Amino acid sequence: RFNFKLPGENPADAGLTFTAIPTIQWAYESGASSSDALNWGAILAVSKAYSKDLTLGIGAGIFREIDDTKAFPVVLVDWRINDRLRLANPTQAGPAGGAGLELAWTLDDRWEIAGGGAWRTHRFRLDRNGPTPDGIGERKSIPLMLRATWRPAPASRLDLYAGVAVGGELTVHDRDGNELVSQDFDPAPLLGITFQARF
């Protein structure tokens, strides 16, 4: 998978901020044609700062994903409930779906714990030499995640993730987009680690 995003924001009067995030993505298996695996579209949203602790917004995502067009609502939340508790979007909305919600608790200057989830769907082109030549695979799930963040310095952070993907469904379409088979899959464990540093 290859992604290209060009986010932009335009602050306006009355405390409104308009956001546009155009995205181009190629999603395909090894052996599939990249020219038939283009996903493209944009997130458009408007948000308003009601106070220094609360920003809310709404918008929509519209994407063309390998012979299928989908649209979904986008809800933007950044609510600092108190000095330690915050409800916000953990990820940026994109072709896979909205930004989800995460509740984070700041323990001290170095540690933060959080939990949240999102709805995710991915379409990708299948191997031209596979059981369904040039077909389309689609995976849907609801990832539920726990996060622990350690900040060893003000400009760096280490994130540890553990969770489970529930409500999973895998669908296979032929090259013309006709559904061939759809099957639920068992909850799958999720683990991740990221490190960020600014210099």
Task: Please annotate each region the language model reported.
Residues 20-26, 58-62, 75, 89-93, ...:
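Transmembrane beta-barrel strands of outer-membrane/channel proteins
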Residues 6-10, 44, 48, 79, ...:
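Residue-level signature of outer-membrane beta-barrel architecture
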Residues 30-37, 69-75, 125-132, 170-178:
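Outer-membrane beta-barrel translocator domains and adjoining extracellular loop/strand segments
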Residues 12-18, 52-58, 84-88, 110-113, ...:
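Repeated loop/turn-to-beta-strand initiation elements of outer-membrane beta-barrel proteins
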Residues 1-6, 22-26, 38-44, 71-75, ...:
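Hydrophobic, lipid-facing positions within transmembrane beta-strands of outer-membrane proteins
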Residues 26-32, 61-63, 88, 100, ...:
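Extracellular loop and loop/strand-boundary signature of outer-membrane beta-barrel proteins
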Residues 74-84, 146-156, 183-199:
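Outer-membrane beta-barrel "beta-signal"
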